[in-house]
């Protein structure tokens, strides 16, 4: 009988969520996470074998000792001083253990050289235990390493290269309370989540306690799993902070199309760039996009349609001036500090 009532409540709340979602824009699970349910970092020390003379040199004593220890585990006894191999490299292996991962699940891993190897390309990672901060082994890693397009052959990945051996227990079912944590602190968004949840469930089940934290109390007729599943689907009118994400290795820059830069002059090394609302006095000025003009001779970027130059236009201009990804990062950070750029910058 109770299960029937629960089903009715579930359908009623889900219907209410759909009707309210039309008024809002961002799901809670996209901007907040449930405290305690998170990824856990794993790390391990291992050896990559099968290298064509590009491994660690004999001067890397920890590598030679590790080889000796590995051989001893299969009843081959040698002193570390007797090993002269260049086909092996010592590496650190890292992975992320997602919540609710089960034994046998596969994890992607990152393998990075820590010795003086020239390259670990073509190598195979020997079985490596991956431990958590508590010292327990949660996964075993092994496999052939693949590399991206960055050009580096000292750090690579193995897709599905680790197998989960130990699970992290999450006791949700019998819980009565939970906590949401916003990914970015914002008082307005915390209050919006509180109001949206209380509207959906028609009860005071959510209380914002600060700019990041919302306390939740489960309704009596729902399990915690059912409750959190519904909470994650509720949408709010999210107040978004503009953000620029930069991958320094690849040079990739991701920014919202509407992020603009106010007039400013920045000098970084040999590069001087001026953001202006006046047309450059240069017949060889280049048109970039959205009416933005760039004068290479004057180091000026300006807009011809009355709007401010966008981050995209400025980045393209800097690249034409020969700026490296590191130069671009430094210049954008200087613009942010001066107040000309109103956006958070995240460097990966």
Swiss-Prot record:
InterPro entries: Flag_FlgI (IPR001782). The keyword Signal applies. One of its GO terms (biological process) is bacterial-type flagellum-dependent cell motility. It is found in: Periplasm; Bacterial flagellum basal body. Its main location: periplasm. Keywords: Bacterial flagellum, Periplasm, Signal. GO terms for cellular component: bacterial-type flagellum basal body, distal rod, P ring; outer membrane-bounded periplasmic space. Residues 1-24 form the signal peptide. GO terms for molecular function: structural molecule activity. The basal body constitutes a major portion of the flagellar organelle and consists of four rings (L,P,S, and M) mounted on a central rod. Assembles around the rod to form the L-ring and probably protects the motor/basal body from shearing forces during rotation. Belongs to the FlgI family. This is Flagellar P-ring protein. The lineage of its organism: Bacteria, Pseudomonadati, Campylobacterota, Epsilonproteobacteria, Campylobacterales.
């Amino acid at each position: 009988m109770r299960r029937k009532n629960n089903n009715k409540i579930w359908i009623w709340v889900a219907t209410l969520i759909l009707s309210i979602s039309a008024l809002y824009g961002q799901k809670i699970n996209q901007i907040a996470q449930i405290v305690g349910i998170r990824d856990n970092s794993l790390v391990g020390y291992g050896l990559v074998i099968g290298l064509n003379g590009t491994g660690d040199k004999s001067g890397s004593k920890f590598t030679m000792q590790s080889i000796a220890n590995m051989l001893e585990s299969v009843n081959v006894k040698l002193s570390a001083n007797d090993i002269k191999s260049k086909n092996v490299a010592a590496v650190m292996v890292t992975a992320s253990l997602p919540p609710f991962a089960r034994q046998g699940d596969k994890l992607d891993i990152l393998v990075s050289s820590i010795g003086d190897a020239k390259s670990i390309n073509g190598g195979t990672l020997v079985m490596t235990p991956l431990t958590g901060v508590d010292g327990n082994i949660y996964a075993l890693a092994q496999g052939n390493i693949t590399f991206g397009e960055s050009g580096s052959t000292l750090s690579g990945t193995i897709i599905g290269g680790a197998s989960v051996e130990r699970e992290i227990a999450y006791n949700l079912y019998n819980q009565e309370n939970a906590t949401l944590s916003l990914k970015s602190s914002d008082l307005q968004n915390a209050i919006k989540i509180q109001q949206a949840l209380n509207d959906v469930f028609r009860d005071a089940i959510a209380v914002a306690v600060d700019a990041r934290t919302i306390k939740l109390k489960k309704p009596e007729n729902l399990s915690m799993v059912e409750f959190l599943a519904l909470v994650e689907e509720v949408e709010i009118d999210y107040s978004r902070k503009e953000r620029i994400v930069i991958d320094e290795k690849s040079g990739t820059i991701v920014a919202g199309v509407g992020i603009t830069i106010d007039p400013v002059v920045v000098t970084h090394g040999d590069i001087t760039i001026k953001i202006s609302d006046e047309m450059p006095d240069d017949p060889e000025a280049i048109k970039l996009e959205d009416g933005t003009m760039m004068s290479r001779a004057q180091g000026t970027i300006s807009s011809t349609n009355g709007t401010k130059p966008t981050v995209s236009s400025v980045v393209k201009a800097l690249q034409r001036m020969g700026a490296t990804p590191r130069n671009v990062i430094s210049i954008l950070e200087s613009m942010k500090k001066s107040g000309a750029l109103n956006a958070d910058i995240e460097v990966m």
